[in-house]
Amino acid sequence: MRVLHVVTAFPRVRGDVITPWLVELIKRQRAQGDDVDVFTSSYRGLGDQVFDGIPVYRFRYFLRRWENLTHEETAPDRMRRSLLYRMLPLWFVTAGMFAIWRHCRRHRYDVIHVHWPVPLALLGWAAQRAGPAGLVTTVYGVEVRWVKHGLRFLKGFLAWAARRSDRVVAISADTARELREIVDVPIEVIPYTTSLPDTAAVALPQPTHGPVLFVGRLVERKGVAHLVEAVARLGDQGPSLEIIGDGPERPGLQARAAALGIADRVVFRGQVTTEELQRSYARAAVFVLPSVLDARGDTEGLGVVLLEAMNYGTPVVASRIGGIPDIVEDGISGLLVPAGDSAALAAALGRVIADPALARRLGEAGRQRVRERFSWDAIIKRWKEVYRAATKGP
């Protein structure tokens, strides 16, 4: 089967941390015999390339100097920087529609798979104008929350995109539920996952030792400020906090830790190697994903870092928000707390750290859940079924 994935951005070089789960999905689809390409935007004039064995076709949309609406940060974040960037989406979409139409006239596909339908549903429409192909649309959640939290004019567009798709897929049950409030169409739920190393030789963490661990970009929706406050609530004899990742909120978080008197117990490690990250997961007493709803209405679509931590048998505590409950069963494979409630978060952390038996039980159950529900074999099988259904029509 010939498949074209349509995305806003895709890795340019090794080490480019852009949609790693999608890269892995495509590599595995190709390994199983499918002919899979990527269609995405250029970055400062970058042309077509082969990335990790994957053919990547890039379209130009503006002058090289300003051709950076994507890749370095999200397009909405970039658009806040200047009037020029707020105008660029028009050029981006127009150029993309013409480019994908030309591309699909030369290269025939069985399935056009659009990720993030706002605005890429327009590129999917243009691709189908070039020749018959099934259209699959994946909704990650942020598009739906834009509609719910201020951008009401997008409601009709998102409904149109869903109705004209042969198959619609959401990455979590929460995203599917929110999308059904906008448009009444059948929606599959297929989570994304990550490549999980074999940890059979890695000892399960000692629950009463090691730091509290967070991994992710330091932005508002990750809720790290509430985690810092929760650690402070655990008192002078509380655990240390290890923060891996970087982002615009780092200076404020460092200042907050100092103001709470725990600067000596909060370690900001920035970016680390894969090997260092794996060691951090394995030695952590508990992993925390304290996500919240940010000012733009965005939150955690799924929370793939939870899968990474659970793979090591590390107990997890996370917010009950977005797609997180699809991964963590409260009281079974982890603990869930109300988003933004640092007191509840502190209580959950204290409970796990003080009870080694609970920590081990949660860790073992989490590890089993990852193996059963989020394996690549299961997810690839689901996508094959969706693609076959899309090519057969309604």
Where are these predicted regions, by residue range?
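A conserved mid-protein helix/loop that constitutes part of the nucleotide-sugar donor-binding site
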Residues: 20, 210-233, 248-254, 335, ...
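Acidic donor-binding loop of glycosyltransferase active sites
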Residues: 282-297, 314
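Donor nucleotide-sugar binding/catalytic pocket of nucleotide-sugar-dependent glycosyltransferases
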Residues: 37-40, 55-60, 134-140, 155-201, ...
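Conserved acidic donor-binding segment of nucleotide-sugar-dependent glycosyltransferases
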Residues: 327-331, 335-342, 351-357
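N-terminal subdomain of nucleotide-sugar transferases
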Residues: 1-60
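Short hydrophobic beta-strand element within catalytic cores of glycosyltransferases
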Residues: 306, 311, 315-318, 328
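Nucleotide-activated donor-binding/catalytic signature segment of Leloir-type glycosyltransferases, i.e.
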Residues: 254-276
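Conserved donor-binding/catalytic core segment of Leloir-type glycosyltransferases
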Residues: 4, 194, 203-231, 242, ...
